């Protein structure tokens, strides 16, 4: 006789892939510890944190929660490409302000921009996509009263953008909270990084490639950014790379060639 004990409400597949959720949860906590292991100060993050499918996923969820997205000139181009008319540089019109730190436009500290944004008393999302490939950057967010979310990604550190995974710290109610409670984990991207966090610290890329970046920038007569992928310039020669007030030259291929990566 068929028992009704195994009848459930949610739609579940007949065959379920065997996944070790203990390893997944362990990775989530290891990721948090890894972030805080940097020689750069990391303080003042929201207490709740969730694994996301990279920061792009976190942005898409943010777009669902807030209508007008405020940004500074030179910010990460995805926001305008994805949201078009919902993105504004008039922060007084924004429902949330997204700021990359280091800043996408030059790879330098964004604390000056965060201070300005904080005066608007609107929720702030800090995008730390360049964490793990930067130096001399202070990630102390305790001075600010309006930071609701801070996101980190491993794509730039490990070159693993095709296996995206990030960690979103937030005081807001994001859809990812529902994912987690309903057992919709981002296992594939996380699994790719299970052992990688043990092989490199958040400062390893700078230690390995920082001097090469400086050498290349010297040869090109440009200024090294605090994010090692970039050199900065204000001449007409490189104006096609202009991002906001600065020409941002991505030299990652040159670094790879120089080091025979």
Predicted regions and their residues:
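PLP-dependent class I/II
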Residues: 1-27, 34-261
């Amino acid at each position: 006789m068929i028992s009704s004990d195994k009848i459930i409400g949610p739609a579940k597949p007949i065959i379920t892939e065997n996944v070790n959720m203990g390893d997944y949860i362990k990775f989530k906590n290891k990721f948090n510890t890894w972030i805080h292991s940097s020689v750069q100060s990391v303080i003042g993050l929201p207490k709740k944190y969730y694994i996301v499918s990279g920061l792009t996923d976190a942005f898409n969820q943010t777009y669902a929660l807030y209508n007008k997205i405020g940004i500074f000139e030179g910010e990460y181009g995805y926001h305008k490409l994805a949201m078009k008319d919902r993105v504004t540089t008039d922060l007084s019109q924004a429902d949330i302000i997204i700021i990359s730190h280091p800043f996408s436009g030059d790879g330098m500290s964004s604390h000056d921009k965060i201070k300005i944004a904080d005066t608007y008393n609107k929720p702030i999302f800090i995008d730390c996509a360049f964490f793990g490939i930067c130096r001399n950057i202070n990630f102390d967010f305790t001075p600010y009263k309006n930071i609701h979310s801070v996101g980190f990604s491993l794509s730039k550190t490990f070159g693993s953008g095709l296996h995206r995974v990030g960690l979103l710290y937030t005081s807001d109610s994001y859809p990812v909270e529902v994912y987690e409670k309903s057992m919709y984990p981002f296992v594939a991207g996380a699994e790719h990084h299970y052992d990688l966090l043990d092989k490199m610290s958040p400062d390893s890329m700078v230690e390995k490639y920082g001097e090469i970046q400086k050498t290349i920038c010297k040869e090109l007569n440009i200024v090294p950014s605090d994010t090692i992928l970039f050199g900065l310039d204000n001449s007409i020669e490189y104006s096609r790379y202009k991002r906001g007030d600065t020409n941002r030259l991505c030299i990652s291929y040159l670094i790879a060639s120089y080091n025979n990566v």
